[in-house]
Curated annotation (Swiss-Prot):
It comes from Danio rerio. The keyword Glycoprotein applies. Transcriptional activator. Binds the cAMP response element (CRE). Activates transcription through box-B element and CRE. Seems to function synergistically with atf6. Regulates FGF21 transcription. The gene is creb3l3b. Its main location: endoplasmic reticulum. Residues 212-241 are annotated as: Basic motif. This is Cyclic AMP-responsive element-binding protein 3-like protein 3-B.
Amino acid sequence: MDHYSDQGGDGIELLDLLFDKNDGILRYENMGQQNNQLWPVQDPHMMMTPQGNEDFFNALIGGSDSVSGSPVWSPSPSDSGISEDPHSDHIDSPPPNASPPMEPHIVVSQTQHSLNINFPFDFNGWETGFLPDQSGGTQCASETPQAQQTTGFPLTVKDLLLSGTPEPAAKVSQQSYQELILTEDEKRLLAKEGMTLPNQFPLTKYEERILKKIRRKIRNKQSAQESRKKKKEYIDGLESRMAACSAHNHELQRKVFQLEKCNISLMEQLRRLQALVMNGSNKPVQAGTCVLVLLLSFTLILLPNLKPFTDTKVSQHGDFSPMRVQSRSLHNLQSSRVLRNLDHPYSMTENAKILPRFPEDKTMEEIASLLGRLHRRPQFTEYDPESHNHSFDQHDEHHHGDPITGHVATVTLNPRRGSRRSPHADDM
């Protein structure tokens, strides 16, 4: 620590030699007005390599016009001071020499010594002051005070160099190192792997890899827990839906069972009704009814084709025609006598005297005498009594006609027994 304090004292003397307002070398140069820029303040916990410090002060003292090639590092945005990206390691592997486009530059002009310095400089990346010693080396001083870290303010080269002046050793030990805070999961995993990490930064590459590995495991564990939680919620939802569907299915099964029971009862009632109908019906009556229906149907079918007793059929076809022929008939004596009286009106009185008379004979005689009188009149000379006397013949024809042949036969009963036969009796 004494070595650092000695180097700090020599640096102050050098700055007083350069920038003292009374007798300094650069007292006539207004550096603040020439390059009055806003210097953004970032994380002060950064360190510059000794090679970079040496190049800067060699250019400042030796008056060289070369630009320092030492890069300026930016701190990691991680909470532990290291990057979580496995492809970036700003502490151990410096970035390329390309300077950012908005990076401020400091130009130092020296009239007497012709010293012009134009180099990239990032004040926010300076963690400690860099002061040259007598042997030409550089060393690290204290951290920049937090009171000077504002968002933007104009600075001169002297202010920049004075801001890096060393502080006491107690402040260096308190401010230059950030405490490493580990969670319970990280501590448990480190203990499980048998690894220990220091309580303060900076960490070595191996320790950083171990810490990244532990934190990656914790992230994977958390993501796995979240996925398991979502899966569990999804499965719970499916189970609830399945329970609801099962309850609905049981309800439907119960309704189906009730409908089946109702159907069975209805079928049983139908069987009973059929049995009652079959037992109450008379089978012979049913058979007789069927026979009558069959006979009626046959009769209705065959009756229009038969018609054996109708006169229209005989008259239409002309197969038979009625003929009046003399058939065998029995004539009584009185009828023969009437016919003879018509032929011989004068012989009727003689025959009447001979034959005994009955009451019927008197009637017949009266009829015969009446017919004879009519025949003797001149207007009835052409009158044929036989052709007009059709009372007996028509009566006999209507009642004694042959229905098959159509012949008409006249039958006359003899009123007297033992009388003699008529002349036409031999026609039989």
